């Protein structure tokens, strides 16, 4: 019986890191203010690399790690809310740069939940076809959407990319044991980035993009209530108990949010690895970056049961229970 396996993980961040102290020189904030409210100490910021550049770096790593030819790729999905352009998609750019001529490629825009949605989409497409290999990447250059004078958002975000290679293998155990996906469109105005408004009259003027804006307190309440519910639902669908989960790999938005989610689930914080202090919030890239690090440090091992969960713009939540 054929099921899917994650055969390669990879991540990449730009070389430039910006500390809280550096931010305090350009806005009214301090290292202590940022750390106590978010857990963030620094973040990586792209200088000239765009979203496709970060994703391409990850894609090349994934292929090298798995010893796979680019022509053997069947599917490339990139989760991002900071694409290079409206069109072509970031995934199409990466497909062209890789020379993966046999792969179809498209983006998924579901903000910080995007990687979870992309994993579900890739799994369903592989299982319903004769395709063998899929590349799923979360990549963001959020720094280009930030108002660097607004401390309520500028201190939170960083740039980076992470991804996995999914391949069909002969195994009796599915990769995704349970899932829970929800969209809360009535709360869409709580997180907004890149909004465009048509100009009146004709001929039209080019519209400008609005910077990132977030209702922080509302998002905190949403995350601390809806993410535990999503995780519990996915665990139940997998016919497991919360205690059966080896690690919970959550979207790295805020250390206080993660601590509260662990408390609500009644699980020890040691089962919730974090890298937010180094990376900040990297949007759809946060979950695969965290997974890559957990695998590299031999925290997550083959046979582990892990819950990957994200939340973000939409508003949206998504959880998958993986038999790693």
Swiss-Prot record:
BP GO annotations: fatty acid biosynthetic process
Sorted UniProt keywords: Acyltransferase, Cytoplasm, Fatty acid biosynthesis, Fatty acid metabolism, Lipid biosynthesis, Lipid metabolism, Multifunctional enzyme, Transferase
GO terms for MF: 3-oxoacyl-[acyl-carrier-protein] synthase activity; beta-ketoacyl-acyl-carrier-protein synthase III activity
Active-site residues per Swiss-Prot or TrEMBL entry: 112, 251, 281
Lineage top rank: taxon: Bacteria
InterPro entries: ACP_syn_III_C, ACP_syn_III_N, FabH, Thiolase-like
Pathway this chain belongs to: Lipid metabolism; fatty acid biosynthesis
Catalysis: reaction(s): malonyl-[ACP] + acetyl-CoA + H(+) = 3-oxobutanoyl-[ACP] + CO2 + CoA
One Pfam family in the UniProt entry: ACP_syn_III_C
Subunit note: Homodimer.
Protein name per UniProt: Beta-ketoacyl-[acyl-carrier-protein] synthase III
Gene: fabH
